[in-house]
Structures are given as C-alpha cells and as structure tokens.
Curated annotation (Swiss-Prot):
It comes from Xanthomonas campestris pv. campestris (strain B100). GO terms for molecular function: nicotinate-nucleotide-dimethylbenzimidazole phosphoribosyltransferase activity. Gene3D superfamilies: 1.10.1610.10, 3.40.50.10210. It is an enzyme of class 2 (transferase). It catalyses: 5,6-dimethylbenzimidazole + nicotinate beta-D-ribonucleotide = alpha-ribazole 5'-phosphate + nicotinate + H(+). This is Nicotinate-nucleotide--dimethylbenzimidazole phosphoribosyltransferase. The active site is at E316 (proton acceptor). Pathway: Nucleoside biosynthesis; alpha-ribazole biosynthesis; alpha-ribazole from 5,6-dimethylbenzimidazole: step 1/2. Its EC number is 2.4.2.21. One of its GO terms (biological process) is cobalamin biosynthetic process. Keywords: Cobalamin biosynthesis, Glycosyltransferase, Transferase. Catalyzes the synthesis of alpha-ribazole-5'-phosphate from nicotinate mononucleotide (NAMN) and 5,6-dimethylbenzimidazole (DMB). InterPro entries: Nict_dMeBzImd_PRibTrfase (IPR003200), Nict_dMeBzImd_PRibTrfase_bact (IPR017846), Nict_dMeBzImd_PRibTrfase_N (IPR023195), Nict_dMeBzImd_PRibTrfase_sf (IPR036087). Pfam families: DBI_PRT.
Length: 348
C-alpha cells in the first residue's frame, strides 16, 4: 500500500444544512447568541452530519500505543516498560480513558503498534505491530519509509472500522513513554520554535528534567536539520502512534467524520495532518488546552480555540473525552428548545 491516499480529497460540510441550522438557532426562545459557543457547535455538527438535528451518540475512541527509542535519553519519569503495562490496563478497563469511554457509551479501540514490554495478544487490543519501538531520534530517523506507511495505515484502519458503525465523532489518543519529546521535536521543526519553548513536564519532569529534555530535542533537530517536508519530518522525528494519529485524522476528514483532538501530542499530529492535507482542518475540533508547555503554540498555528482548560496533561484522549458532554448538550439544546412561534413567545 502506498501513502498517496493521504492527499485524497476531504469531504465538505453541507452549507445548506449549516444555513438551516443557523436559521433555527435564530428562532429559538433566547436572545440571539445567548448560548454562545454552544450554538456554534450545534450548527457545526449539523453541517458535518448533513442533518439539521445533529446528535453526538456514536463515538469511536482509538488509543495508539508505541514505544520510542528516545526514551533511552532519560526524558521521562517512568520506565519504558510502562507503555506495555498500560496497554494491559487499557484492555482491562482500568485506565482513565477506559472509564471515560464507559461513562460516555463510546467504543474504545486500543491499538498496539509496538512496545518493548509486549503484552502479547489481548482480546480487546488490535495488534498492528510494526517494531518494539521506533528508533532514537537523536541518532537516526524514527521510522523507515515502510514503517511510516504502516503506521499511517493503522490509523486509517480505525476510520474504516468506525465508518461501518455510523460513527458520528472520532477521538484519537496515544500512549508511549518518550512521546512528548518526539512531539515537541516535531513541533519545533514544523513551527521553527526553540526546544525550550516546546519541551514540557510530560510525565512530571522537574525544571532540571525539562532542561535536559530540551537539550535532547536540540540534538535531534540537529541530526535531522535537512528534513524539508512535513512528511519527512514526521518520519524522522515522530513515532508510530503519532503517525497513526495523522493517518486517522486524514482518513476521518476524507470520510466526513468529525474529529475531537486531544492534547499536546494529538495536536502535534493534527498539525502534521493539516500540513499534508489542508482539507483536514475543517473537520477538527479541539477538546482542551493542555498544561503541557508547547500546546498553546500548536493551537495558535491551527487557529484553534479549545473547549476546555482544566490543566490536564494525561493524554490517552482523556481531555477530549471530558469535553464530549458539552457537544451533546449543544445538540440537545439545538434540537429540543422551542422556537418563538412554537412557544407563543414574542420575538424581539
């Protein structure tokens, strides 16, 4: 399978339905704009779903797990074995995102792309194995061209499965010790930012640890200074799970499935996806502003205003999942409120 598919045309939201939904908002029993962004969200989902009465009930959450060679540089508070251990935890339902998915009635897909501490075959985990870890970005490219192709395809496969269920919203998450370092390095390359501006606490680093992380990122950027395109930067500085997110975002936009983007790492993947296929941007909604240092710069680059700011930095799609009740509320208000005519209330 080639990767030419990533440049395929994205779906286009329905402008007629959008106009009809906006007209309905103007007739609901409230002052115009009184429900603020909730009104905008309902109209946006109407256009995405081509339905004047949108709902957000069928949700697909995919968490991509993979290890990183750069973990050998001591950039995390946790040992690399944690990635594989968390895959087991996802499968058993004990992780934060597993709890949130149950509360939301969402489908949770866990994808093992390659971890050092391999848990083997698990009943609730899709095995899309590429390698035990991507390479150390301080020494060589994170992925070979074939590995990048396979990681992108693993993300697209999530969307192929989600489409068969009539999914109304896709949420992507990640797990991988060292992946905030890879995401920060990738973001620096895409945004021409200094490592000191993008390196954050990740799993809980102190000031000394963050400074070391920035030094590691500086080394990686020097090794890959000649990476000239977004795709090549992804291949050299990213990781399997970051590339899978990129593939999922592009495939979702092509399929007309809205995406709720999670935190720092997921937003770095979103920026790559938009660079590779600008039509993706119209299908992205951003769940929250992470506590991770570099997230604000990524959001600015995407001209994105997230729904929440709760000082989260867990990943796993957890922050995005927390925002889903807001989307449901927006649609419920849009669909359930009476118009002035229906209620017999005088309009302004």
């Amino acid at each position: 399978m080639s990767i030419e598919w990533i440049q395929g045309a994205c779906a286009v939201p329905d402008a007629r339905v959008q106009a009809a939904a906006l007209a309905r908002q103007e007739q609901l029993t409230k002052p115009p704009g009184a429900l603020g962004r909730l009104e905008q969200l309902a109209v946006q989902f109407a256009a995405w779903q081509r339905n004047e009465q949108p709902t957000v009930q069928r949700i697909w959450i995919a968490v991509y797990a993979a290890d990183h060679g750069v973990a050998a540089e001591g950039v995390s508070m946790f040992p690399q074995a944690v990635t594989g251990e968390m895959v087991r935890n996802f499968a058993r339902g004990g992780a934060a995102i597993a709890v949130l998915a149950r509360e939301l009635g969402a489908r949770l897909e866990v994808v093992n792309l390659g971890v050092v501490n391999d848990p083997g075959e698990l009943s609730r985990v899709r095995r899309a194995w590429i390698a035990p870890a991507c390479a150390n970005i301080c020494e060589q490219a994170a992925m070979t061209p074939a590995q990048l192709r396979d990681a992108l395809a693993a993300g697209a496969e999530s969307i192929a499965q989600a489409r068969t269920c009539g999914t109304q919203l896709f949420v992507g998450g990640e797990m991988g010790i060292g992946n905030s370092t890879a995401a920060a390095a990738l973001s620096c390359a895409l945004l021409s930012q200094f490592p000191q501006a993008m390196a954050g606490a990740g799993t809980g680093l102190d000031a000394e640890g963050i400074a070391h992380k920035a030094t590691v990122i500086t080394r990686a950027l020097a090794v890959h200074a000649d990476a000239a395109t977004p795709l090549e930067r992804l291949r050299r500085l990213g990781g399997f799970e970051i590339a899978a997110l990129v593939g999922a975002y592009i495939a979702a936009a092509q399929a007309g499935i809205p995406v709720l983007v999670d935190g720092f790492i997921s937003t770095a993947a979103a920026l790559v996806a938009v660079h590779l296929n600008p039509g993706v941007r119209e299908w992205l909604l951003f769940g929250h502003r992470s506590q991770e240092r570099g997230h604000a710069a990524l959001l600015r680059a995407l001209e994105a205003e997230p729904l929440l700011q709760l000082d989260l930095r867990l990943g796993e799609a957890s922050g995005a999942a927390v925002a889903i009740p807001l989307l449901r509320t927006a649609c419920a208000l849009h669909n359930g409120m009476a118009t002035f005519a229906e209620a017999g209330v005088s309009d302004a």
